[in-house]
Amino acid sequence: MKIVLASNNPGKLAELQTMLAPLGVELQRQADLGVGQAAEPFRTFVENALAKARFAAAHTGLPALADDAGLCVDAFGGLPGVDTADYATRFGHARGEANNVRALLEQMQGIDERRAALVSTLVAVRSPDDPEPLIAVGRVVGQITRAPRGSNGFGFDPVLLLPGLGKTFAELPAEVKNAHSHRGRAAQQMLALLRERWL
């Protein structure tokens, strides 16, 4: 089965291809099929993921899988949340993962409450009008470090310390990260849903 990934993020594609490999599905980036980015006008991960999945399905004629993910920092009332990808631009930096990390660490200077969660919401639709989308949510809670640690992964991986492991996601090998990450948890739920309802 071929499924279009409603994302152009190469990190998400690599992670999700590995995580969904047991199903034998072929995951293809929407950009490779000539599809642009969907609008993400909503304030929740699930609404944005659903909008992205429906958009990709409508423009490709294929079932679609979308991921909307972000960092929710307790000290900031859950922000940046759905605005995670553009977080740095709020503070005068160019858009980008390294600048997001930089902006986060700058904004957290002098803040002792460093609890945060990475959240991944996966939504799969068989068609643009699918009345029963599959929805899976993964969440991992950790502490924001005071400086980046590790060189693996992407996004906020270098600054989210996992208390149970004593390491950031960026300090872990990919297979360990995938087993413990927010996206890995959501993907495991999605695997079960796809097996039960689609395959």
From Swiss-Prot:
It is an enzyme of class 3 (hydrolase). One of its GO terms (biological process) is purine nucleoside triphosphate catabolic process. GO terms for molecular function: dITP diphosphatase activity; ITP diphosphatase activity; metal ion binding; nucleotide binding; ribonucleoside triphosphate phosphatase activity; XTP diphosphatase activity. The keyword Metal-binding applies. GO terms for cellular component: cytosol. Its cofactor is Mg(2+). It catalyses: XTP + H2O = XMP + diphosphate + H(+); dITP + H2O = dIMP + diphosphate + H(+); ITP + H2O = IMP + diphosphate + H(+). Keywords: Hydrolase, Magnesium, Metal-binding, Nucleotide metabolism, Nucleotide-binding. Mg(2+) binds at D68. Belongs to the HAM1 NTPase family. PANTHER family: INOSINE TRIPHOSPHATE PYROPHOSPHATASE, INOSINE TRIPHOSPHATE PYROPHOSPHATASE/HAM1 PROTEIN. Homodimer. Pyrophosphatase that catalyzes the hydrolysis of nucleoside triphosphates to their monophosphate derivatives, with a high preference for the non-canonical purine nucleotides XTP (xanthosine triphosphate), dITP (deoxyinosine triphosphate) and ITP. Seems to function as a house-cleaning enzyme that removes non-canonical purine nucleotides from the nucleotide pool, thus preventing their incorporation into DNA/RNA and avoiding chromosomal lesions. This is dITP/XTP pyrophosphatase. It comes from Verminephrobacter eiseniae (strain EF01-2).
